Amino acid sequence: MKGYRILIVEDDVMIGDLLQKILQREGYRVIWKTDGADVLSVIQKVDLVIMDVMLPGEDGYQMSAKIKKLGLGIPVIFLSARNDMDSKLQGLQIGEDYMVKPFDPRELLLRMRNMLEHHYGTFTQIKHLYIDAVTKKVFNESLHDEVLFTAIERKIFFYLYENRDSILTKEHFFEYLWQLEDRNPNIVNVHIKKIRAKINDQAGEMIENIYGEGYRLNTVVKK
């Protein structure tokens, strides 16, 4: 589950700081806001929201309603000191989960993992990319930022992915991409360059050019 982007909206500095450290230690990427003022400006960059109900200004329920209107399908876990049934039911009607403070971080992590698996399924991650080999979709940074490949770019990328960590020569590409009647060797280079730009790999760390041989999609990228 590592690599998912989590937005924490919590005005209690002690709780917010603790949550941020715990989630980062588990491999999550965290954005922390102390109120809902600019939540909507970052919401498209995250995969899950952990939100306090009692916030300065608009409360968590109001902010969650605004998030849902965007139609992004981002799950929300509410945190609240209110333990009465009416508060719990209200939270569960608006968000996906409701946890009462104080809570056990281990329980929160388990609920988060289950929620992320339920909403997003299982993706393969390479550096900042999320790759779904079933739907043939690729996402940059967040699961709400799909890479918009052309048909030929998608075919090339997933050919590399299916043969990841192996070198594919230009002849391999020509044989696989039968619709490429133009056997100009540069045609492969052109498409690879466009793919790299779309996946933020201009340096060629993920899709590496092996001089004199071909290209390789690296699953382990050197830092």
Curated annotation (Swiss-Prot):
GO terms for molecular function: phosphorelay response regulator activity; transcription cis-regulatory region binding. Phosphorylated by YbdK. GO terms for cellular component: cytosol; protein-DNA complex. InterPro entries: CheY-like_superfamily (IPR011006), OmpR/PhoB-type_DNA-bd (IPR001867), Sig_transdc_resp-reg_C-effctor (IPR016032), Sig_transdc_resp-reg_receiver (IPR001789), WalR-like (IPR039420), WH-like_DNA-bd_sf (IPR036388). The modification 4-aspartylphosphate is found at residue 52. CDD domains: REC_OmpR (cd17574), trans_reg_C (cd00383). This is Uncharacterized transcriptional regulatory protein YbdJ. Keywords: Cytoplasm, DNA-binding, Phosphoprotein, Transcription, Transcription regulation, Two-component regulatory system. It comes from Bacillus subtilis (strain 168). Pfam families: Response_reg, Trans_reg_C. Residues 121-219 bind DNA. Transmembrane segments: none annotated. PANTHER family: REGULATOR OF RPOS, TWO-COMPONENT RESPONSE REGULATOR YBDJ.
